[in-house]
Amino acid sequence: MKHFQIPSFSVLIIALALPHIVEVQSSAEKLDFKSSIVDIEGLGAMSFPNSGAAEAQEAFFRGVLLLHSFEFTQAAEAFRKAQDLDSDFALAYWGEAMTYNHPLWGQFDGKKGQAALLRLAPTREARQAKAPTERERRYLNTIETLFFFEGEKETRDRAYMKAMRDLHETYPEDDEARAFYALSILGSKNGSRDFATYMQA
């Protein structure tokens, strides 16, 4: 895969940690992000509490960390492995769907993203029922917005950005929500880049 000089997720996370971020008091379930850090050799460490089976965790975390590096093909393979190990692991299907959206390059495969989510369950309601926690349901909702929301891609990008903002504001200690929200801001500009957008991200 050809690599481009673009901001990494690490840079986006650092930028979003600056003081201009508005802190939001959340009434959501209490999650301990600091004590649930997982280290995947060669890729890095992260915290992403989830309800997947223990045997599917390494593949899932590998998939998310590969997303950080924009290694979409390898990430999709890792998420599918997590699905094989736990067929009801909702976030593994969320992760695979994420690999079919490349917002910084304006690349989007809606059919593959929808197919990944439909393998979890045939309807939005059934997919939501597969997610045991409110936070996981919110993650699923963001990707549903991107792949199933009516309207042109630009409209769906804006709706996805709003859904990611809501997720980030509900779980301000969730670094993954913070990073994916930053990426959604950049993706909402339909491939164009400007200073104001980068500052917002």
For each predicted feature, which ranges?
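Bacterial N-terminal signal peptides
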Residues: 8-19
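N-terminal pre-domain segments of enzymes
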Residues: 24-53
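Amphipathic alpha-helical repeat scaffolds of TPR domains
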Residues: 54-62, 88-100, 128-151, 173-191
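Canonical positions in the second alpha-helix
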Residues: 81-82, 120, 167
